[in-house]
A protein has these predicted regions:
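N-terminal Rossmann-like dinucleotide-binding module
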Residues: 1-48
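Short active-site oxyanion
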Residues: 28-32, 48, 66-68, 118, ...
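Structural detector of well-ordered beta-strand residues that form the stable sheet scaffold
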Residues: 53, 92, 117-119, 149, ...
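Rossmann-fold dehydrogenase core element
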Residues: 106-123, 143-150
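Predominantly a Rossmann-like dinucleotide-binding segment in NAD(P)-dependent oxidoreductases
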Residues: 124-206
Length: 206
């Protein structure tokens, strides 16, 4: 069995979950971590007994990576993915995939052209409740799905947005609560009914 060599780009809040998921597997090895903040990269690397980098392209060029996990602010997902796919490195990126259609399409095209896999993190599909609903729908136990309604009631404190300079910004986050939290629920609906969206009708207020 091949052991996949993995690098993680971004050592922020979500980093520990990605690192743990890699290190608990017998078929994967965390060989390097990268962050533009040198102290943070060095701290995580020391904790996990791995190498630290401060430039993800340098990490990709130096290490023989099979996969990178991208844990960066939303607007940086596309350039980091492009850097990986052109080097024929598989990508697992945090959601959302990108902050606009053009970036998302470029990411998909780059992965296809270079024969690598591009994955996006939507972990709620693996929650026990989500699995139960999916199985009941797939088996026909609940009958045919005619319509669905999403309601998201998550709350985020002011501190959540104040702790970084990109959260809650259109140009870097890409759409506030819709793209940061509600995207999980929208993904579940698509997965439950096994269908893509035909049209979107939306409103927003504050």
């Amino acid at each position: 069995m091949k052991t996949l060599k993995v690098g993680i780009i971004g050592c922020g809040n979500i980093f520990p979950m990605h690192a743990a998921s890699v290190m608990e597997r017998d078929d994967a090895e965390l060989v390097a971590v990268c962050d533009v903040k040198k102290d943070r990269a060095d701290e995580k690397a020391e904790q996990l007994d791995t190498k630290s980098y401060y430039d993800y392209e340098e990490m990709m060029d130096t290490e023989q990576l099979d996969v990178v996990h991208i844990c960066l602010p939303h607007y940086l997902h596309a350039p980091a993915t492009a850097a990986a796919t052109k080097r024929q490195i598989h990508v697992m990126t945090e959601k959302p995939m990108a902050i606009n259609y053009d970036d998302a399409k470029a990411m998909i095209d780059g992965a296809k052209e270079n024969g690598v896999t591009l994955g996006v993190i939507f972990q709620n599909r693996y929650n026990p409740g989500s699995q139960l609903i999916k199985n009941m729908l797939t088996s026909g136990e609940l009958g045919a799905v005619k319509s669905g309604k999403l309601q998201v009631t998550w709350d985020r404190s002011d501190e959540y947005y104040q702790n970084s300079d990109w959260k809650g910004t259109w140009d870097k986050e890409g759409g506030g609560v819709i793209i940061d939290q509600a995207i999980h629920t929208m993904d579940l609906m698509r997965w439950f009914v096994d269908s893509e969206l035909n049209y979107v009708d939306a409103s927003i207020s504050n």
